[in-house]
Amino acid sequence: MANIKSAKKRAKQTVVRNERNTGQRSMLRTAVKKVIKALDANDAAGAEAAFAVAQPILDRFSARGLIHKNKAARHKSRLTARIKAIKAA
């Protein structure tokens, strides 16, 4: 355990940030899973609606550094490709 006041504060901040980041990461995963679930059900309209919700979340969290920008780009690219494939079929 930290003895210095500033170290105690930093430890407390770390706990708070960890909880916040964990919750936000969970929200992100849930949003992406909703798109995938709609895609698996061949529901193009539902997938597009879910993707419209997931895309700004991916952008926002990559801008904040919660996930890497390339990971966000990869998710968006793959989901968009799957949505286009379902619409074309």
UniProtKB/Swiss-Prot annotation:
<keyword id="KW-0687">Ribonucleoprotein</keyword>
<dbReference type="InterPro" id="IPR002583">
    <property type="entry name" value="Ribosomal_bS20"/>
</dbReference>
<comment type="similarity">
    <text>Belongs to the bacterial ribosomal protein bS20 family.</text>
</comment>
<comment type="function">
    <text>Binds directly to 16S ribosomal RNA.</text>
</comment>
<dbReference type="GO" id="GO:0070181">
    <property type="term" value="F:small ribosomal subunit rRNA binding"/>
</dbReference>
<dbReference type="GO" id="GO:0003735">
    <property type="term" value="F:structural constituent of ribosome"/>
</dbReference>
<keyword id="KW-0694">RNA-binding</keyword>
<feature type="region of interest" description="Disordered">
    <location>
        <begin position="1"/>
        <end position="24"/>
    </location>
</feature>
<keyword id="KW-0699">rRNA-binding</keyword>
<keyword id="KW-0689">Ribosomal protein</keyword>
<feature type="compositionally biased region" description="Basic residues">
    <location>
        <begin position="1"/>
        <end position="12"/>
    </location>
</feature>
<dbReference type="GO" id="GO:0005829">
    <property type="term" value="C:cytosol"/>
</dbReference>
<dbReference type="InterPro" id="IPR036510">
    <property type="entry name" value="Ribosomal_bS20_sf"/>
</dbReference>
<dbReference type="Pfam" id="PF01649">
    <property type="entry name" value="Ribosomal_S20p"/>
</dbReference>
<protein>
    <recommendedName>
        <fullName>Small ribosomal subunit protein bS20</fullName>
    </recommendedName>
</protein>
<dbReference type="GO" id="GO:0006412">
    <property type="term" value="P:translation"/>
</dbReference>
<dbReference type="GO" id="GO:0015935">
    <property type="term" value="C:small ribosomal subunit"/>
</dbReference>
